[in-house]
């Protein structure tokens, strides 16, 4: 029987596995190398979510790096499923609440949380605990209707050439992506890049037209100022809805490079980052860096 790898050993192997991109066309490899600047991730460990979140924001330079006074903050959480917080189908309501409180304290004019759900939205918002958390902290969680969407062109898209996107996402002064990390039957994993499907009107098109490519295509267009991945608990199987087998990394992952963020999060599932189609494609397209040997990862204990 093969000995179980430590987290450090697994990440080391994932770094070595980055050599797999050599099978990509030369011009695409060159684009990826040239456009992927050295990314930095802060991985905060602990069990006290408010303390973990405050620590991560401080490491990222504080709210002055992201917010302007009276600006519109749009927080893209995962609130798609009518499941309980402990089941890991949605972003932790405690994390959502803490982020909204921080934004309000830092001077945000409003904090909006649009989410096109998979389960009926009233049930999803209530059962996930996110509706109550958002209301307590001064945020507005809502299910977008047809009138809330605007059609946009995805100029660098390969499979996805246009999309109807929630207008508030397009108009945000500060756009924050706060997904939960979990398994997914179609995309293998859903982390930050996949999370944007909850901000578009027709997610079915993505599923029918090369899902991994569409996920990467949309990330050529959408540029959040901050990404915070909820990896306090992760759903290893039966995602995205669950229930499934759970693990408890007790981590929050902070960054601005969606490809680097997702590549690191993939290792929590003992996956090589480039075994995930949309991570490999996004790296090749130059959206960010999925090669963990080129990413600065700072671990912080709280």
Model-found features: residue ranges?
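N-terminal and secondary-structure boundary signal
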Residues: 2-302
């Amino acid at each position: 029987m093969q000995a179980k790898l430590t987290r450090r050993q697994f990440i080391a192997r994932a770094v070595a596995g980055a050599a797999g991109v050599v099978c990509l066309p030369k011009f695409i490899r060159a684009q990826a190398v040239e456009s992927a600047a050295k990314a930095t991730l802060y991985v905060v460990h602990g069990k006290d979510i408010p303390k973990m979140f405050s620590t991560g924001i401080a490491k990222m330079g504080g709210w002055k790096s992201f917010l302007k006074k009276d600006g519109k903050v749009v927080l893209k959480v995962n609130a798609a499923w009518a499941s309980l917080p402990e089941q890991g189908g949605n972003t932790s309501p405690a994390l959502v609440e803490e982020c909204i409180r921080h934004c309000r304290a830092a001077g945000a004019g409003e904090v909006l949380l649009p989410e096109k759900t998979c389960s009926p939205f009233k049930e999803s918002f209530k059962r996930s605990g996110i509706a109550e958390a958002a209301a307590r902290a001064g945020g507005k969680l809502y299910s977008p209707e047809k009138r809330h969407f605007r059609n946009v062109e995805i100029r660098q898209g390969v499979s996805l050439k246009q999309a109807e996107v929630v207008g508030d996402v397009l108009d945000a002064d500060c756009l924050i992506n706060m997904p939960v990390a979990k398994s997914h039957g179609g995309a293998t994993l859903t982390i930050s890049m996949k999370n944007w499907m909850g901000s578009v009107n027709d997610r079915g098109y993505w599923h029918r037209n090369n899902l991994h490519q569409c996920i990467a295509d949309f990330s050529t267009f959408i540029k959040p100022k901050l990404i915070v991945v909820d990896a306090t608990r992760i759903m290893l199987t039966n995602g995205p809805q669950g229930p499934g087998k759970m693990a408890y990394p007790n981590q929050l992952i902070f960054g601005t490079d969606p490809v680097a963020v997702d590549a690191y999060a993939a290792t929590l599932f003992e996956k090589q980052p480039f075994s995930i189609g949309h991570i490999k494609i996004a790296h090749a397209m130059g959206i960010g860096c999925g090669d963990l040997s080129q990413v600065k990862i700072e671990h912080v204990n709280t």
